[in-house]
């Protein structure tokens, strides 16, 4: 049969102008109330499609028939009355125009058609709104009765082929229903959710994940996105509009079985969060409802698929967001004269509010957390977000704002004024560590930003208390002759004490315009990511520890990967926590000369410089080995920097000619406290709490000294943005993911070799005597492992020495368990091979600031140290701070609510109930009621609890053949495990006697003994299990060990520790608190 011709969908009532509505009502002489009553019957008496196709083909193609069959059935959840008004209006216009054309084919077909078919045709025809006055009188009683039945089931999916269903009979029954008052039950509806599959998340679990194709139910065409499927359904007419209003007045009409409807109610709330129109925010019960809504309202054309193209004319700010946007600048606006006045913010919001879309409904409150709509939201309030915090100027793009901040230096003023006033900046709350650093003299060294790092970096990087102070001689041969405006130092005295000959270069807007095209996609992606983070933070629903839009973070174009690029220059992302100003100066870096040409396509390798680098590395190794033998441990400066992929400008040329006195501290190889002879005071970075893991994905594969080797920095097309995103994501997820190393990269091989040489040098030299006390030591320890947790304990060295005044980056990690880090204070001359790159240090100090915004409760477990240098002197002197660990790091056994003594009694009773068969296998027999009574009376456990414990044990034994204290029962060779001392016993009788030795009484005496007697016996009894366990030399001294928590005794220290961990859930660190040693008798 030919498919029904599809009429172009109307706009929803929300988009019909008020003048048209008024005109339509005047033409027809109807008020809205009459029309509302009218709309019902028109939807109910739909013309049956199949019968009509045979009976009156010419009528089928007329617009009036299409309107009645398809359009009048549009009582969607949006606005019932206004939708009906729109139906009425368009229907009346069409019917006036084409009444004559419609009636002619009707006369032709009356001869051949039966009386029933004619009734159906005329009823359908009269149900049009053109005949509304007649219709009102003719069908009002029927509509009242039939209201609930036909709309009882809300929408179902779109395929609806059923040969057994009689369309004609159903239509006639509905038409003549006014006659029979007794028929209250509805016809079985073809579109009810019982007969058809719902496209719900339970049946099609993967449909919302993007893993599956979106298929059209009618023609099975597959589409990648829901929008494409919606467009297809619109063009081909492969959908049926079942958006009836649900009838709340008549619950008897509910067509679903009760159990089914309850099951569907479970996931209804979750489904409505997903099945939401991204334009208007309405929720729908099924995917088909959503698709029909999108088709009828054309909303799918209004949702930006990936990125905003043009700003929306009417800026949509829902009323519920007004308060949130008012708070945008308050936390970080400085009180300086240039600060944005608060009044202008509210005025702007009022202006935006007046322009806002009049059709926003209360449901819209959650409409912007969904899909691509965060891009809309960003466009709507771009002027609020992209605003300079210092002078209040708005910008259209992040690039312009960044250029403005760089050129004017406003980011320094904003941060400094906020710090002077003592106001915390939102991204970097002032922690106690900052206050300890205020006394130290600091020189702020802000550095130039590249175009590409701008979206993600925030004022956190500018905090003057975190800036790096570096003492170096710049190699003049390699100095670039461009003009480099020198940064003014804030305190005058600092210029005298710090001999810095570095020059700084701020990017101009012209530089930004010359940026290579390849970086723009990344900029947009990062811009979207930051935008969504802002929106989620304002909405109050951050997830992933501040990275709300994980989907946006991974929607990045596949960039060309350079061998250096995989681990090199990538931007760390920082979400704005409740703050909307994206001020994005780059990481503060020292002594970076500007790139000579920003558009160089490929870095040229200077092999002569590479040879020099190799020579310098080998020389430094030799010097390290010599210096390590000196007792005072003077350190030789390194020439090498190993930046983290989180640092933003890795490839720019770094001039490094360090003097022999002031070196750089390495962040990679071995624990490295500084030497005392250093004079330069430098602020230490805020320590990150124990257990926070900062990921350094390819830390050792690329060195900052590649700048010596490359004439030009690698440009953005060779950046792998996913490595930066992954590293920051992993910080929040607590995972230490290691991306694959570039195997054939000569640079990475070179620096791996130098790392291993330095490590060998550290291990080969015996640790000298510890001549200085621990308080002279810097408490920041580092080692090579990429995935070790951080244990940066707080405190600063007495003389404020850090070699070369380098800011210590919180990425480098110190194992809490390694006390060797202190003893190897003088040994750690491998210092010279650690990273001296201020790039990495500042990038990672920013990330540490971001971590402070996360809750303390998410700290992850510390992993065990694996570097060789740590293992060398594990038993050396200990630091109090190094042994402090957070509760989350402590190893917790399984928490059991059982009293261990009760478990022993139950296990012994169960073992006693095992019966051995003639084949040698054991079978379980139940405990007698008397035995259970004795256990219950003694232990205080209820009979029900005892029965449940026994049933659980039997179930586990039948299902898996073993349980916690008994394995291999089904094989005939059972193994019994003692919970207390981890002994393994082969026979039930031995096991029972062993448990009785722990308990201090025999099970057969259980009924005779009183609780007091048993407790006294337990206290006096010494465990005979000492004979079974082979004692270690430390236990030959005539001691046994008693648990203070339950007064049981054990033969070995290992046994009591095992008992404390398994039974009481105590950490190994706390074992000494709960164990008392007893003299053997």
UniProtKB/Swiss-Prot annotation:
Pfam families: zf-C2H2_6
Encoding gene (name): TSHZ3
Name under which the protein is recorded: Teashirt homolog 3
GO molecular function: chromatin binding; DNA binding; DNA-binding transcription factor activity, RNA polymerase II-specific; zinc ion binding
Keyword Chloroplast: no
UniProt KW keywords: Cell projection, Coiled coil, Developmental protein, DNA-binding, Homeobox, Metal-binding, Nucleus, Phosphoprotein, Repeat, Repressor, Transcription, Transcription regulation, Zinc, Zinc-finger
DNA-binding region location: 891-961
Tissue: Expressed in brain; strongly reduced in post-mortem elderly subjects with Alzheimer disease. Expressed in the fetal neocortex.
Residue ranges with Basic and acidic residues bias: 238-247, 473-491
Functional description taken from the UniProt entry: Transcriptional regulator involved in developmental processes. Functions in association with APBB1, SET and HDAC factors as a transcriptional repressor, that inhibits the expression of CASP4. TSHZ3-mediated transcription repression involves the recruitment of histone deacetylases HDAC1 and HDAC2. Associates with chromatin in a region surrounding the CASP4 transcriptional start site(s). Regulates the development of neurons involved in both respiratory rhythm and airflow control.
Subcellular location: Nucleus; Cell projection, Growth cone
Gene3D superfamilies, sorted: Classic Zinc Finger
Compositionally biased tracts (Polar residues): 335-364, 581-603
Disease: TSHZ3 haploinsufficiency due to proximal chromosome 19q13.11 deletions causes a neurodevelopmental disorder characterized by developmental delay, absent or delayed speech, intellectual disability, and autistic features. Some patients may have reanal tract abnormalities.
Assembly and interaction partners: Interacts (via homeobox domain) with APBB1 (via PID domain 1). Interacts (via N-terminus) with HDAC1 and HDAC2; the interaction is direct. Found in a trimeric complex with APBB1 and HDAC1; the interaction between HDAC1 and APBB1 is mediated by TSHZ3.
Compositional bias annotation for Low complexity: 148-161, 856-869
